[in-house]
């Protein structure tokens, strides 16, 4: 029994604590479950949101860069364009139909252009150049050099090239422009699309944008031959600049000054500041006119001091090259106003100051040579004592020498007479020329007086033309006077028919100095003073041609058209009268007069004589688009005040 009493409560008491222990265990187990599940979920959500934010920010940055990158690429897009590929001569021959005349597009300055279709169905223009001429080879190298550097929608791209050594042919392949060049479309075919003012104004803006792109490169590219025949039109009549045969990179001028050094005597030797012209990135091509003749190269000795104010050019002849001074160099630098002393008579012969004394040095030298050969009196006495026959021989020799001396004097006198006669004849010719010039000048003054009386306004360029010489290289700036045109009409009938006018607009360029009427005055000189302002001047002429629909020089044959023959001179006269609207092409449709007058004023600013006075192409483009305010025209283009009439003139 006691065992039963002890074992009986055990099953009764055991469940009670178990139940009590399990009741509070439920909430504790619930708390452990919440701490293990919710924190990882929150962390995962936060991480996902943060990663999503990062991806969105990266995508936004890439999208913004894509939108802002095209202008930067256009500014420096030279490496983007692929280099021209080489074609075989046979493939280009098949593409052009064996260069048939039916596919001929025109004649350029250095070759004939043919139309062709290469593999893939792409239409191209193939220019066949003559490799025998130096100008053709220069253009070929220029085109290939600039092909990979110029990448602009306003520049005609070069697709490829070909060089046939057997036939000595150089070929360039361009992208075909469907509407040809601006010269043909505007002045010959008279395309109806260009009769709309908006289309013509857009062509002017496209050309300005293309030139601005060339000038914005580093180093700047100078086209050198901007004219309508070098502007091509695509299917949408968008203008593109072509023909980089005369293009060049702008040269950088670096002044190198050397400190003065002391000579051995203690005197200061002045060094002349030299200007070194360098072209960056253009070492393989040399398009300047360099004189490499032996007469132009001379060695300057270290002992001769040259001052900056007194350097004169002396031509070095082969005879002079043989004689050198102690330092081993020929004397080739002289000072103005001071005669360089030398022991050699030939150096004095080259001096301009002592030309009249050349004969004296020659006579001294001849006399010294005769004295060397002439025997002395003692020799004559000894010879007479020895034998009489030898004395007779000596007398004969001396008589011959004296006769030779007299013959030289007679020749000198004859030369003097001939020279005097030539001088007299030269004086007569000069006098006749001066009389003829005076007569022409009087005729000009009468014509200008009649012109001023008709206009009622004075002309600045006419006054310059009357005071200046008529043989200036920039004669087209001042305009052709009526006397010149009348004289041309009397001499030839071709000038009346317009052959002279056509010569200024054809695409051929006979020289490496640009095209007449489009080249700037400083570009026509033989110095290397070439800058971007040369293209600005050419663009001014092209802008006047585009607005007026006339050539720079055009003569129809009527006497009333004489004053309008020179387009630049006529524009200046209209600016002084305040009638710029008269210059606009009368066949234009939808004309905006304010915009047309703006274009003419911009062209006049580009046609200023001094390069520093002309605006840059960036400013020109800003003026045309209205982004830059148009400056006032110079006083020579502004309308002149009315003439004051006195009482005596009224009576």
Curated annotation (Swiss-Prot):
Residues 26-40 are extracellular. SUPFAM superfamilies: Protein kinase-like (PK-like). The chain crosses the membrane at residues 41-61. InterPro entries: At4g25390-like, Kinase-like_dom_sf, Prot_kinase_dom, Protein_kinase_ATP_BS, Ser-Thr/Tyr_kinase_cat_dom, Ser/Thr_kinase_AS. Residues 66-87 are annotated as: Disordered. It comes from the Eukaryota. Residues 99-633 form the Protein kinase domain. It is a single-pass type I membrane protein. One of its GO terms (cellular component) is plasma membrane. It is found in: Cell membrane. The active site is at residue 225. GO terms for molecular function: ATP binding; protein serine kinase activity; protein serine/threonine kinase activity. Keywords: ATP-binding, Cell membrane, Glycoprotein, Kinase, Membrane, Nucleotide-binding, Receptor, Serine/threonine-protein kinase, Signal, Transferase, Transmembrane, Transmembrane helix. Its EC number is 2.7.11.1. It catalyses: L-seryl-[protein] + ATP = O-phospho-L-seryl-[protein] + ADP + H(+); L-threonyl-[protein] + ATP = O-phospho-L-threonyl-[protein] + ADP + H(+). Residues 69-87 have a biased composition (Low complexity). ATP binds at residues 105-113, 127. Residues 62-651 are cytoplasmic. Residues 1-25 form the signal peptide. Its main location: membrane. Belongs to the protein kinase superfamily. Ser/Thr protein kinase family. This is Receptor-like serine/threonine-protein kinase At4g25390. It comes from Arabidopsis thaliana.
């Amino acid at each position: 029994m006691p065992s039963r009493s002890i074992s009986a409560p055990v099953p009764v008491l055991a469940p009670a604590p178990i139940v009590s222990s399990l009741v509070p265990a439920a909430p504790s187990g619930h708390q452990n479950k919440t701490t293990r599940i919710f924190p990882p979920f929150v962390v995962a959500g936060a991480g996902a949101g943060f990663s999503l934010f990062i991806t969105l920010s990266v995508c936004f940055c890439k999208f913004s860069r894509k939108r802002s990158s095209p202008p930067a690429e256009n500014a420096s897009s030279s490496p983007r364009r692929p280099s021209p590929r080489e074609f075989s001569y046979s493939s280009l021959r098949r593409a052009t139909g064996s260069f048939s005349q039916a596919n001929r597009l025109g004649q350029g300055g250095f070759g004939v252009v043919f139309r062709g279709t290469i593999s893939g169905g792409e239409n191209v223009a193939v220019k066949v150049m003559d490799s025998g001429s130096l100008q053709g080879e220069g253009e070929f190298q220029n085109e290939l050099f600039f092909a990979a550097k110029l990448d602009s929608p306003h520049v005609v791209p070069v697709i490829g090239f070909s060089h046939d050594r057997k036939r000595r042919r150089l070929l360039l392949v361009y992208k075909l422009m469907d509407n040809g060049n601006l010269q043909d479309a505007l002045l010959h075919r008279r395309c109806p699309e260009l009769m709309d003012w908006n289309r013509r104004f857009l062509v002017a803006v496209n050309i300005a944008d293309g030139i601005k792109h060339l000038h914005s490169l580093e180093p700047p590219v100078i086209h050198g031959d901007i004219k309508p025949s070098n502007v091509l039109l695509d299917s949408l009549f968008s203008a593109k600049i072509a023909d980089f045969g005369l293009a060049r990179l702008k040269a950088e001028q670096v002044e190198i000054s050397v400190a003065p050094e002391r000579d051995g005597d203690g005197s200061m030797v002045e060094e002349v500041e030299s200007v070194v012209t360098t072209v960056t990135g253009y070492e393989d091509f040399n398009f300047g006119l360099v004189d490499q003749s032996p007469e132009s190269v001379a060695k300057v000795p270290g002992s001769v001091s040259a001052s900056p104010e007194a350097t004169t050019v002396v031509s070095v002849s082969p005879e002079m090259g043989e004689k050198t001074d102690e330092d081993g160099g020929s004397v080739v630098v002289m000072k103005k106003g001071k005669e360089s002393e030398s022991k050699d008579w030939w150096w004095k012969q080259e001096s301009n100051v002592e030309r009249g004394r050349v004969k004296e040095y020659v006579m001294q030298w001849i006399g010294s040579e005769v004295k060397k050969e002439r025997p002395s009196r003692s020799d004559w006495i000894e010879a007479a004592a020895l034998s009489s026959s030898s004395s007779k021989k000596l007398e004969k020799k001396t008589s011959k020498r004296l006769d030779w001396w007299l013959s030289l004097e007679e020749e000198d006198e004859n030369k003097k007479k001939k020279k005097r006669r030539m001088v007299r004849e030269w004086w007569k010719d000069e006098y006749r020329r001066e009389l003829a010039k005076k007569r022409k000048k009087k005729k000009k003054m009468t014509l200008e007086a009649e012109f001023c009386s008709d206009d009622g306004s004075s002309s600045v360029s006419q006054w310059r033309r009357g005071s200046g010489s008529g043989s200036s290289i920039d004669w087209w700036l001042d305009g052709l006077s009526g006397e010149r045109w009348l004289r041309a009409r009397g001499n030839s009938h071709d000038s009346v028919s317009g052959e002279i006018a056509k010569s200024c607009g054809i695409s051929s360029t006979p020289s490496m100095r640009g095209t007449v009427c489009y080249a700037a005055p400083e570009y026509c000189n033989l110095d290397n003073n070439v800058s971007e302002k040369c293209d600005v001047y050419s663009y001014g002429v092209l802008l006047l041609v585009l607005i007026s629909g006339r050539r720079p020089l055009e003569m129809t044959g009527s006497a009333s058209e004489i004053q309008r023959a020179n387009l630049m001179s006529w524009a200046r006269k209209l600016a002084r009268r305040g009638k710029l609207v008269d210059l606009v092409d009368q066949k234009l449709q939808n004309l905006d007069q304010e915009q047309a007058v703006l274009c003419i004023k911009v062209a006049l600013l580009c046609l200023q004589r001094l390069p520093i006075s002309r605006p840059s192409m960036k400013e020109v483009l800003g003026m045309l688009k209205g982004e830059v305010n148009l400056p006032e025209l110079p006083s020579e283009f502004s309308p002149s005040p009315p003439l004051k009439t006195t009482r005596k003139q009224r009576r």
